[in-house]
Amino acid sequence: MVNKNRQLKEQKVAEIKEKMGKTEAMIMVKYQGLNVEEDTELRKALREAGVEYRVYKNSLAVRAINELGYEGIAQYLEGPIAIAMSYDDPTAPARIINDFAKTHKALELVAGYVQGEVFDVNKVKELASVPAKEVLIAKLLGSFKAPLSNFAYLLSAIKDKKEAEEQA
């Protein structure tokens, strides 16, 4: 029986380790005080953004974090903690959770681990203010478009001027 229990725990640690090893960002929150409806609303918003939201037994999560060599983050796993993990957009979990916490005071940001760096609450809030990757790409493309449009207009004006000179 003890062996079976230990084996199940080792499997769970391996699963947690696999998920955490692939993440771009992990944001930890205290969720105690959220009712079922609020928790479901948060989970839905995170799921729609491709963010996985899990509650793990802290001792198993700490073991996975230590095995991965993620230093400085295990200390935040005390009490009822949920972890939001994003596999592609490092800003998504911070942004969604921060917005949700503004209207649901029971949800409390604890810390984050983003691309190998530990983020305290203030850094997580800064990360939350960074626009989504798609918005940043759109802004970048927009900044390229304006000079290109101006250059095309300039070429058109030169062409029109030459045509006018040839006709004169």
From Swiss-Prot:
An annotated GO BP: translation
GO CC entries: ribonucleoprotein complex; ribosome
GO molecular function: large ribosomal subunit rRNA binding
Keyword annotations of the record: Ribonucleoprotein, Ribosomal protein, RNA-binding, rRNA-binding
Source superkingdom: Bacteria
Record bears the keyword Iron: no
Reported function: Forms part of the ribosomal stalk, playing a central role in the interaction of the ribosome with GTP-bound translation factors.
Family: Belongs to the universal ribosomal protein uL10 family.
Protein name in the entry: Large ribosomal subunit protein uL10
